[in-house]
From Swiss-Prot:
Keywords: ATP-binding, Ligase, Mitochondrion, Nucleotide-binding, Protein biosynthesis, Transit peptide. Allows the formation of correctly charged Gln-tRNA(Gln) through the transamidation of misacylated Glu-tRNA(Gln) in the mitochondria. The reaction takes place in the presence of glutamine and ATP through an activated gamma-phospho-Glu-tRNA(Gln). It is found in: Mitochondrion. InterPro entries: Asn/Gln-tRNA_amidoTrfase_suB/E, Asn/Gln-tRNA_Trfase_suB/E_cat, Asn/Gln_amidotransferase, Asn/Gln_tRNA_amidoTrase-B-like, GatB, GatB_Yqey_C_2, Gln_synth/guanido_kin_cat_dom. The keyword Cytoplasm does not apply. One of its GO terms (biological process) is glutaminyl-tRNAGln biosynthesis via transamidation. SUPFAM superfamilies: GatB/YqeY motif, Glutamine synthetase/guanido kinase. One of its GO terms (molecular function) is ATP binding. Its main location: mitochondrion. Subunit of the heterotrimeric GatCAB amidotransferase (AdT) complex, composed of A, B and C subunits. One of its GO terms (cellular component) is glutamyl-tRNA(Gln) amidotransferase complex. This is Glutamyl-tRNA(Gln) amidotransferase subunit B, mitochondrial. The lineage of its organism: Eukaryota, Metazoa, Ecdysozoa, Arthropoda, Hexapoda.
Length: 531
């Protein structure tokens, strides 16, 4: 079987790490009942990767003891003033440029007023009126193996990118009937990215979030650890029949993973369609995604618009960014011109390079690039000094063999401690015909169990006799024995039933525990059966 055929046969559902964010059924706007159409817009809060907070020198540390990372200004002690963190501005500009946004030469901060116990000032500092950047476009591939037949590209416009501070965290104790407040998160720097409602399915929304994660990680502007709350996604969803006005939207919050983005949106679309088909009404409300029950739950009504009483922040001057002309030196100047020259290669550029340089399929390029660890292994194996390896063999091995073993063991790629050098050694053994795909998986399974300090693949194969039988004399004797033991099968083959040849080859594979060289085995069987 060819590598491409093996790739097609073994392609499995692939997610934010190596498992898919696919829902059970393919999301297809054309297939919605009664010609319903869905409209989806995302709001993403990304925690800026900075050592200190947006307006104070307090440390940003996930998992720190309660209230251990709080400056006086974070607790809104009277007499304290905010001081803008330059690093956060630079990373915000860097992100805006990567998304094709137009960076504003002058932006401003506002106060957004609302009352929560974990917001001691009674307002949040944000950029509502004059954000750091506007416009922009994010184009991304939508491809879920086993769900979408072929990848296609979708684009979502970026409405604006703004800087803002996070609130603290309230901890409710229903037994003691008390609420406790942790201000470690208060003042943590955030970028809010608001996308236009250009999406139609949950899969498209999940693909957008995945692409955004790849971009932010490459830029170094956000860790994107959703399990730590470093990236939070809110989805605005509405449905309407074709050729009718847009429906009433709901906002779904608390979406904590890429896979949950697709699940939450598809659930909410189905819920709204059911309500409208039953003659009901959709309310403009905020709903929470329950990952355990896999459904959205009403939180609060938005029918009455809340007045946040936005006003200019009097304690912060306008933010000036140098956006055109020659690079402007100086510690007090953030230069978008200079930042643009330092942008890394973005994921889509990497995919195009893989397809054009290594002649891999777009599907393979998407799977390789969509996982940072997988792409790192691919590059390490190909770029090893003094070695020339086939990109197709390397890609197929990583996708079909490594990911299959990890998926079988429910191990994430980041938790896999097999070194790239060991993976490269298995590729070499495949290319030199010392092992086949079956033996490669046995070796991978053993290497996974042994971990980083385990034996090399060559040692594992030698100790367990997991090397292919390539000796022609030995294979010929096996062929003769099988032919002699199966006279009826031989007779059928000689009468024109060519498939019987593979029945004989299958017997040899069983006898040798899949270690016989099948190409040589088939050749020898054909030659012996002609006599």
């Amino acid at each position: 079987m060819s590598w491409n055929a093996l790739f097609r046969r073994n392609l499995f559902i692939f997610n934010f790490r190596h498992r898919s964010f696919a829902t059970k059924k393919a999301a297809n706007p054309v297939a919605r009942p009664n010609r319903w159409r869905s409209v989806i817009g995302l709001e993403v809060h990304a925690q800026i990767q900075s050592e200190s907070k947006l307006f104070s020198g307090a440390e940003v540390s996930f998992g720190a003891p309660i209230n251990a990372c709080v400056a006086l200004v974070d607790a809104s002690i009277p007499g304290t003033l905010p001081v803008l963190n330059r690093r956060c501005v630079e990373l915000g500009v860097r992100t805006a440029l990567a998304l094709g946004c137009e960076v504003a030469p002058v932006s401003a901060f506002d106060r957004k007023h609302y009352f929560y116990a974990d917001l001691p000032a009674g307002y949040q500092i944000t950029q509502q009126r004059a954000p750091l950047a506007r416009g922009g476009l994010l184009t991304f591939p939508v491809f879920v193996p086993g769900v979408t037949k072929k990848p296609y590209y979708k684009s979502a416009r970026v409405h604006q990118l703004q800087l803002e501070q996070d609130s603290g965290k309230s901890l409710h104790d229903p037994v003691e009937r008390k609420s406790l407040v942790d201000l470690n998160r208060a003042g943590v720097p955030l970028m809010e990215l608001v996308f236009e409602p250009d999406l139609e399915t949950g899969e498209e929304a999940a693909a957008l979030v995945k692409e955004l994660i790849l971009i932010l990680t490459r830029l170094g502007s956000c860790s994107c650890r959703m399990e730590e709350g470093a990236l939070r996604v809110d989805a605005n969803i509405s449905v309407h029949r074709e050729n009718t006005p847009l429906g009433t939207r709901t906002e779904v919050k608390n979406i904590g993973s890429v896979r949950a983005v697709a699940q939450a949106i598809e659930y909410e679309i189905a819920r709204q369609i059911d309500v409208l088909d039953g003659g009901g009404r959709i309310f403009n409300e905020t709903r929470n995604w329950d990952a355990v029950e896999r459904k959205t739950i009403a939180m609060r009504d938005k029918e009455v618009v809340q007045d946040y009483r936005f006003m200019p922040e009097p304690n912060l001057p306008p933010l000036h960014v140098h956006v055109e002309g020659d690079y402007c030196e100086g510690d007090d100047v953030v230069s978008a011109v200079k930042i643009r020259t330092d942008l890394p290669e973005l994921p889509e550029e990497t995919r195009k390079s893989i397809v054009e340089t290594h002649h891999l399929t777009p599907e393979m390029a998407i799977i390789l690039v969509n996982d940072i660890t997988l792409h790192s292994h691919f590059r390490s194996i190909l770029d090893e000094p003094g070695k020339t390896r086939s990109p197709k063999v390397v890609a197929n091995f990583l996708i079909n063999e490594l990911l299959t073993i990890l998926n079988k063991n429910k191990v994430d790629l980041e938790e896999c401690h097999i070194p790239s050098s060991h993976l490269a050694e298995i590729v070499d053994m495949l290319e030199t015909n010392r092992i086949n795909q079956y033996l490669a998986r046995l070796i991978l399974q053993e290497a996974l169990e042994q971990g980083a300090s385990g034996q090399s693949p060559s040692q594992i194969a030698a100790d367990r006799d997991w090397l292919m039988i390539t000796d022609e004399a030995k294979i010929e004797q096996l062929c003769r024995d099988v032919i002699q033991r199966n006279p009826k099968v031989v007779e059928k083959y000689r009468s024109g039933k060519d498939k019987m040849l593979y029945a004989l080859a299958g017997d040899i594979a069983k006898l040798t525990e899949q270690k016989a060289d099948m190409a040589r085995t088939v050749e020898l069987l054909k030659r012996l059966l002609k006599k």
